[in-house]
Every structure is written in structure tokens, then in C-alpha cells.
Amino acid sequence: MALIIRSEIDKATQAITTALPWRDYYELTKPKVVMLMLLTSLIGMLLATPSPAPLWLLVLGNLGIGLCAGAAAAVNHLVDRHVDVKMARTFHRPVANGRITPTNALLFSALLGGVGLWILSSFINALTAWLTLASLLGYAVIYTLFLKRATPQNIVIGGLAGAAPPLLGWTAVTGELDGHGLLLVLIIFAWTPPHFWALALYRKKEYAKAGIPMLPVTHGDSYTRLHIVLYTVILIAVTLLPFATRMMGYCYLVGALVLGAGFLYRALKLLVSKDPKQGLETFKFSIIYLMALFVVMLVDHYLFPIPVYGV
């Protein structure tokens, strides 16, 4: 029955995408992931200065960053096509499914990346363009080609590339590196392991079938649950740094502590739970947590500004 349903889904998908091939290329960019990255990039832009940056800079900066993120996602589709066909979550992807050829995926990625870097270097600044290129290569090459299949710490090491967008947004506005911008990167860097390991617990069998050495596959569920708790504690500590450095005020401190307590509760619940769906619930909550934390940052930054900006 499952095979029949899967066959019918494939037929329906093929019929739709044959009529609307642009949808396949849109899917190639992982739009949901890119949108999350652009939200964090926008947060970086809005936090970089006491008053909002010009609209044209926000639009062009995020356009360039978004195109480069889409380029990296397309490379991920290309490299992972043999793995994607083994996983229920990804077997329908356009390259894995054969709807887009590897050559066309590579050309599409090169086009997006080239245009994105041109926008950043021509209209924003060279620093942002170079940092975006480094992030693109870090995700598409270092993580996707090597780390993902090499070590269960793939998410920890490779998470730095995915944590870069707020810094890219920050440098797009200021044109220079800043410790506060790096703090935003550190927050996402600490958030990434518990976020993805929670999903890996739920998708453990699929990762094992595909040969991806995610932590639950190599070290077991109990070990992974414990590390989710430990990294959540680290995350909470990291989120206090913006207050400690006077980047943020008391409004942020209260919000960060409340949200952190909620995340820790979820992590502890996952630690003792035997329900496999609890991993998925923790994964979903982690996304809400990150967005809520950044909203609190914006509220604190604009409604309760500290007297002396910076350190």
C-alpha cells in the first residue's frame, strides 16, 4: 500500500512540475530554509545601528545573501541526490527524482551565486560579499561534501556556515566586523546542534539507511538526548552574553531567560521521554524559540535602548 501511495504521489508531482518546471528550480533553493536565514540576516541589519538602515540596503543586501543561500542549497541537492532517494523526507527532491539534471542544477547554482555576489560587491560592500562567499563554500563544499558524511559532529562543526547570516546582515549595514554581530553568530551556532539533533532523533532510521552518521545513529538515542540538554544549557549561557556586554538591556534579559527555560524544559522532557515524536516537537519548538529570541532583541533595541550603544 505504501508503495502504491508513493507511486501516485510521484505521478502527481511529475504532472504538476511538467506543466510548471519553474517550481522545481524554486524547490532547489530550499525556500523555507532560505527564508529563515533571511530573517536572521534582517535581524542583523536592524540591530547593527541605533536606527533602521535605508530600505534599499535592506532589500538589496537580503537579495544578494538570499541568492547565494539558494546557490548553496542547489549544490546540496546536487551532492546529496544519491542520499536523498533513500529518505522519505527527501526522495521527491527535483535532482534526486530526476526532474532536474545534475548539470542544470550546477549551472543554476552558479547563476544564483554569481548574481548574488555581484549584487553584494556592487551595491553593498566587499566585506559582506567575501563573508557570504565563505559561508556559501563552507556549507556547499566543506559541510555537504565532507563533514556531513565524515563525522557525527558534522552539525557542530558545519553549523558555523549556517550561523553566518546575522553577521552578513550586520556587515551589510556597517561595512565592518563587530563583536556584537559575532555574538549573533555565536547564538545560532550554539542553537544549531540541539535543533538538528532533535530532528535526527525523529528521523534516525532514515539517516541510518542513507549512511549519514548523525549522532543518534552513531552513539544512540540516550547519548543524543543528553547532549541536547547540555547544548541547550550552553545556548542559554550564550544568550546572556548580549546583556553582559551591554548590547541588550533588561527587557532582553527577561525574554532570553523565559525562552531559555522553555527550551530547557523541552530538552529535559525529551531526555526522559520514550515517544519518538517528542524529537519532532522539540525541533519545531527550537525554531519558534530562535525567532522569538530575535523578536525580543528587536523590541529591546528599539523600545528600550540602553544609554550607551555598544561596549
Swiss-Prot record:
Subcellular location: Cell inner membrane
Family matches, as CDD domains: PT_UbiA_Cox10
Keyword entries, A-Z: Cell inner membrane, Cell membrane, Heme biosynthesis, Membrane, Transferase, Transmembrane, Transmembrane helix
InterPro entries (alphabetical): Protohaem_IX_farnesylTrfase, UbiA_prenyltransferase, UbiA_sf
Any single biological process term in GO: heme O biosynthetic process
EC numbers, comma separated: 2.5.1.141
Residue intervals passing through the bilayer: 33-53, 55-75, 104-124, 127-147, 155-175, 181-201, 228-248, 252-272, 287-307
Keyword Hydrolase tagged: no
GO molecular-function terms, A-Z: protoheme IX farnesyltransferase activity
Catalyzed reaction equations: heme b + (2E,6E)-farnesyl diphosphate + H2O = Fe(II)-heme o + diphosphate
Pathway(s) it belongs to: Porphyrin-containing compound metabolism; heme O biosynthesis; heme O from protoheme: step 1/1
Any Gene Ontology CC annotation: plasma membrane
Main location: membrane
One Pfam family per UniProt: UbiA
Record's bilayer topology term: Multi-pass membrane protein
Extra remark beyond the main annotation: Carbon 2 of the heme B porphyrin ring is defined according to the Fischer nomenclature.
UniProt function note: Converts heme B (protoheme IX) to heme O by substitution of the vinyl group on carbon 2 of heme B porphyrin ring with a hydroxyethyl farnesyl side group.
Family membership noted in the UniProt record: Belongs to the UbiA prenyltransferase family. Protoheme IX farnesyltransferase subfamily.
Name of this chain's protein: Protoheme IX farnesyltransferase
Gene responsible for this protein: cyoE
